[in-house]
Amino acid sequence: MALVPQSITYLDPTMKVGKQVVGLNGNMIEQEAVFAKLALREGVSRMYPFELSGGMARRVLVSTALISHAQFIVADEPTPGMEMKDAVQALQMFRDMANEGKSCMLITHDLDLAIHVADRVAVFYDGRLIDVTEARNFQSPELLTHPYTRALFNALPQNEFRHYSKAEVEQFLMTKEGYDVRY
């Protein structure tokens, strides 16, 4: 198991990032290949974390998990601070890993990115799991069975940013059979 932590402060400020990525299980050839796929230019491996931009540091954290050959990766908000092309590439690498029979749990607020690489999407509200649906169901709101999940879909920029009040959200949760905001 490997973790892509949410905070870039998990990088050791006293150690060059290449050495951190290689760690105990990797090698320089693998590290260079993963860095190249994540658009981390030559020379980044010889830098300290404080010399990196936020997006570069996040890509280094993703590299650390990918080079570990873990069968399961937990990626906690891995893409904030990355340029869109870099975020898409990082998530595609997780998708490729899943296609090879490994698993990744992506924790994110970026529903737009997640639905393009995920098999399933788990929706939480107020710390509670309220829905699990196939990612492909986000192609059409009528495929989404839970009202709150539909509300999230409608709140996406391409769906006119439909805003729901807290009372409306709680009403959604109360009206769906088997879901109750109080449990």
Q: What spans do the regions from the language model cover?
A:
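Q-loop/switch helix immediately C-terminal to the Walker
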Residues: 6-7, 13-27
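A short, surface-exposed alpha-helical micro-motif characterized by mixed small hydrophobic
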Residues: 114-116
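Conserved ABC ATPase signature
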Residues: 48-52, 56
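H-loop/switch region of ABC-family ATPase nucleotide-binding domains
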Residues: 108-109
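A short, proline-enriched helix->beta-strand linker immediately N-terminal to the Walker B motif
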Residues: 67-71
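Short catalytic/signature loops enriched in Gly
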Residues: 134-183
